[in-house]
Amino acid sequence: MERAVRSSLLTMVGFASYQGLRLLSNLVLTRILFPEAFGMMALITVFLVGLTMFSDMGVGPAIMQSKRGDEPAFLDTAWSLQILRGGALWGAACLLAYPLSLIYEEPALAWYLPVSALTLLITGFNPTKFETANRHMRAGRVTIVEIATQVVGLIAAIALAYATRSVWALVVSGIVSSVAQLLFMHVLIPGPGNRFRLEKAATQELIHFGKWIFLSTLCGFVIMQGDKLILGKYLDLDQFGVYNIGYFLASFPLLLGAMVIRRVVIPVHRESPPRQSRENFLRLRKMRFIATGVLMVMLLTVALLGVWLVQVLYDPRYLMAGPVVVALACMQVPQIIVLTYDQAALAEGDSQRFFVLSAAKAVAMTLSLLIGFEMGGLFGALIAQGVAMVAIYPVVIWLARAQGAWDPLHDLVFFGAGTVLATSVFWLHWDDISHLIQ
């Protein structure tokens, strides 16, 4: 438990630093570049994330939960598969660039996407000792690597933006960040390096575990990027850029929670399965109450201050991001409540149930976004994201009960408190939010 708390705190400090640097970069770049540049980069990011998730074999979770997760042969095989995947992703990006530029009616995508996709090729060479450090909850060096990488990317982005005043600044700085991350991982994280080899048994284990992760991440792409994929098609680039800034500010607590839980819950579940004893379940309940409470306070604080934050931090071109922050943060309350349950399945190696939950989320999110946007434009799409997460709660219960992790007391307490507080924040900012209704 002590290691888990220490790892959680280090992860939170690292993530706060990382997001703080991102915010600083965002603030500087919005004053150098134009809203359309952020809209274009958001589109590029959607496609890169899509390619990454469409080919995810779950190497990180596999290393964290496998009994062979510390064996050199297993780690080298995982690294080798990761390299092959990175090369395939870059090739796919090159092939898709021109067709996507036609679909989204943005000719520049044909040039930006292949160059940006070099980041996928580079990250394929990241050593597995990064995941080994996460497996053993040694978050100190991991945090240093993440912060150092972000600092390099920030400096590169600002310098290039000042020099070029174009989207190329964001594209090239992404490549610089990937190279820096690779170097920092090799230099700063202790442990042996990897060599290229494909052990048959390790390959079979990784593929067996990863086949459901692969399907889950297809769904995960829709869950995490579906709003941008749909809104990127129907909104103008400048409007889409403003939405993306609102999303960045609103999603800080959710992204923080997801990172902490991914790095801490899987090891804790592996060492103390909740269905093994009442003591283990109560220990997990305590962790869950603390985590959800902290994240919900952060989320609703962001919602309460969203309009003011945008007014203070950004120039008038981005003011509509304020009500986006408020609405989106309020709609993320259901996600915060159930955030720990899906990782419980991965901790048990049950990637099949994890896929079923991911598929349910993807279907609910897609249908809700399409219906919401059709009925209420951007406002409807924002509300839809909260509705989708409430709709799939029965599937969450099914998964959590199978792992002995479902805690109805926790869910009831935070759903009641979250609903009352989010409704109050919504009512307080209704005059601003109403401007989103089309």
Q: Could you tell me what each predicted segment is?
A:
Residues 1-23, 72-80, 109, 140-144, ...:
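N-terminal membrane topogenesis motif
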Residues 4, 140, 167-168, 183-224, ...:
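Interhelical loop/hinge segments that connect adjacent transmembrane helices in multipass membrane
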Residues 25-28, 36-55, 119, 179, ...:
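Alpha-helical transmembrane segments of polytopic membrane transporters and translocases
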Residues 38, 97-116, 278, 282, ...:
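Interfacial segments at transmembrane-helix termini and the short loops linking adjacent helices
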Residues 110-117, 144-191, 208-209, 247, ...:
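Hydrophobic alpha-helical transmembrane segments
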